[in-house]
């Protein structure tokens, strides 16, 4: 298995995995994923084996310290030399859940963001996943300003 960045040819596969992982109101559409890949392919980390993508993480870089709903929809808010790596999705293909795939990709994202000189990483998650992200050093900052998909999210931050 290897971790690589996204290519335009990956969009359909990524959209399928996203759709299988989130309710439609929460997950990114194929069009949204295509827009993100076009603007910041290096902010997609894909775990693949052969031609099969098992998991991926994506999000952009910004100087804004908090994750907002607008960030999900506008890839042009990406600031390549920004201070914070945002994470929008941490997803695993259904056939590969509970194999440690998402953890492996997330560890790589953390290492890459630190090596790039970012201040840290910000993501939002549902309350039931706070413990999962805490094991990587993320701290729960409480309920997020984001109401993406009409869901209550917790903002988690890993500061380097």
Q: Could you tell me what each predicted segment is?
A:
Residues 56-91, 97, 146-153:
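Conserved acyl-donor/pantetheine-binding loop and adjacent beta-alpha core of acyl/acetyltransferases
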Residues 106, 111-125:
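Conserved GNAT acetyl-CoA-binding A-motif
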Residues 7, 126-127, 136, 146-160:
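C-terminal "cap" of GNAT-fold acetyltransferases
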Residues 2-14:
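A short beta-loop-alpha structural element at the N-terminal edge
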Residues 23-50, 56-77:
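Active-site rim helix/loop that mediates acceptor-substrate recognition in acyltransferases
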Residues 92, 98-111:
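Conserved acetyl-CoA-binding loop-helix of GNAT-fold acetyltransferases
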């Amino acid at each position: 298995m290897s971790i690589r960045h996204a290519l335009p040819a990956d969009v359909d596969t990524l959209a399928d995995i996203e759709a299988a992982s989130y309710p439609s109101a929460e997950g990114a559409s194929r069009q949204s994923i295509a827009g993100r890949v076009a603007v910041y392919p290096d902010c997609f980390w894909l775990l693949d084996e052969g031609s099969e993508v098992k998991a991926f993480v994506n999000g952009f870089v910004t100087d804004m310290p908090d994750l907002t709903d607008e960030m999900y929809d506008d890839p042009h808010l990406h600031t390549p030399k920004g201070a914070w790596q945002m994470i929008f999705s941490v997803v695993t293909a259904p056939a590969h859940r509970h194999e440690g795939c998402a953890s492996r990709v997330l560890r790589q994202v953390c290492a890459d963001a630190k090596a790039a000189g970012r201040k840290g990483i910000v993501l939002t998650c549902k309350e039931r996943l706070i413990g999962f992200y805490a094991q990587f050093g993320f701290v729960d900052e409480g309920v997020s300003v984001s109401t993406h998909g009409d869901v209550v999210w917790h903002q988690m931050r890993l500061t380097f």
